[in-house]
Amino acid sequence: MDNKFLTRWVFSTNHKDIGTLYLVFGIGSGMIGTALSMLIRLELSAPGTMLGDDHLYNVIVTAHAFIMIFFLVMPVMIGGFGNWLVPLYIGAPDMAFPRLNNISFWLLPPALILLLGSAFVEQGVGTGWTVYPPLSAIQAHSGGAVDMAIFSLHLAGASSILGAMNFITTIFNMRAPGMTMDRLPLFVWSILITAFLLLLSLPVLAGAITMLLTDRNFNTTFFDPAGGGDPILFQHLFWFFGHPEVYILILPGFGMVSQIIPTFSAKNQIFGYLGMVYAMLSIGILGFIVWAHHMFTVGMDVDTRAYFTAATMIIAVPTGIKVFSWLATIYGGAVRLDTPMLWAIGFVFLFTIGGLTGVILANSSLDIVLHDTYYVVAHFHYVLSMGAIFAIFAGFYFWFGKITGYCYNELYGKIHFWIMFIGVNLTFFPQHFLGLAGFPRRYSDFVDGFAGWNLVSSLGSTISIVGVIWFVFIVYDAYVREIKFIGWVENTGASWSSLEWVQPSPPMSHTYNELPFVYGSYSALRPRNS
């Protein structure tokens, strides 16, 4: 390994190279997470045990959740697309703190190794991603596995907090002259709001898991009633992080879809730009005051439950504004159904279904029945597996040419979309029926009455796996054929609505050696010299 390679990839201070590292790391982690999900669906494809005991099943479920959240969606959306695009969008030469950016990435591989390693220590972490005590306490999980998982979360959390500080500073301080906040592309807004959510929510998680660590190892009793503690306190702390976290996972997806839809509808800008910004801000703020809707079954006062029900439903309003603005952008446009647009439309449609089941679950009385059933699993997988992941694929196909300089095969991309669309819907739609029938989460075995829909669900996941393998082939194919990427903008008739298309594809290692000057409304940003 020569020195030049080390300098470029290990000691990198270039936002593009670090963004590429994040993307590659995220895709690699996603493969592991997908393999784990396939193991889950194999175990559940028929009654009876396949993998072994319940505990092993729960270890797989826990690892699947942590990997998909902390090592796929966040690194790809915020670290990958965020690093690559935010400086390009705002006309900045790089991120504000390039070396901080480097360590933000390099904290993640050790975190992943710790998480995977925890499965090989004693019996592994069979707590679910929520890590509730007393199951995660030393009595139920003796040995070092949970401690390793906690340390893994500390590293991943530190990485995200440092990255968030970097993005906030960059977006506030490094915008090109004329790039005022009301001209900021929606993707940049989404990353900014996400960064604030990370900065405010992750320290609470860090506090909670540190208290759990001391409970396990130093005889404190934060979460042990025998010593005057309360396990419900952990749930409050965890979900105060956990609920903003789900918006952290989806907001950059909103931003990406908001960049893609106007381009393929031949529109200069999104419908209702300012409304979109305020909607994202509202979602970010409301996300912090609804956390206890995850805890309707722990025995809260009826008036507390009423408040959290109402507050949760209010989030549907800004979300609805976003959905209808996307639809209004498409309406009347010369829509071109290229691959990124297919993913974006799929995102809007399926995310809306996930949102509707979310409104149902917001009712505390209904949630008491549906809590910890597969209805909840179906709900958040519609939002994540078909919201976040579809947005990631939309962004990947949209910016693939910009990042690599190569064209992927358009037909192959569309085939990928349809395989995944059929696969994920076949996987998760039947889970609504299972949940309504009372099939509980986190069980590896079940009575025969649930066998039918579980088999359908497992067939769907097999189709999704084929889609993932096909995706790897598409990337390989693009690199082998080396067809030069020209650009979407020339093809779709939209004007340059953002700065990144002014750059060549792939962009030079250092962009904006001279600061661009941005003028005109949001709808027609151009550097002065074009």
Curated annotation (Swiss-Prot):
Binds 2 heme A groups non-covalently per subunit. Binds a copper B center. The keyword Cell wall biogenesis/degradation does not apply. The chain crosses the membrane at residues 20-40, 59-79, 105-125, 148-168, 186-206, 237-257, 270-290, 313-333, 341-361, 380-400, 417-437, 455-475. Its cofactor is heme; Cu cation. CDD domains: Cyt_c_Oxidase_I. Pathway: Energy metabolism; oxidative phosphorylation. GO terms for biological process: electron transport coupled proton transport; mitochondrial electron transport, cytochrome c to oxygen. One of its GO terms (molecular function) is cytochrome-c oxidase activity. Ca(2+) binds at E43, A46, G48. It is an enzyme of class 7 (translocase). O2 binds at Y247. Its EC number is 7.1.1.9. NCBIfam families: CtaD_CoxA. PANTHER family: CYTOCHROME C OXIDASE SUBUNIT 1. Component of the cytochrome c oxidase, the last enzyme in the mitochondrial electron transport chain which drives oxidative phosphorylation. The respiratory chain contains 3 multisubunit complexes succinate dehydrogenase (complex II, CII), ubiquinol-cytochrome c oxidoreductase (cytochrome b-c1 complex, complex III, CIII) and cytochrome c oxidase (complex IV, CIV), that cooperate to transfer electrons derived from NADH and succinate to molecular oxygen, creating an electrochemical gradient over the inner membrane that drives transmembrane transport and the ATP synthase. Component of the cytochrome c oxidase (complex IV, CIV), a multisubunit enzyme composed of a catalytic core of 3 subunits and several supernumerary subunits. The complex exists as a monomer or a dimer and forms supercomplexes (SCs) in the inner mitochondrial membrane with ubiquinol-cytochrome c oxidoreductase (cytochrome b-c1 complex, complex III, CIII). This is Cytochrome c oxidase subunit 1. The gene is COI.
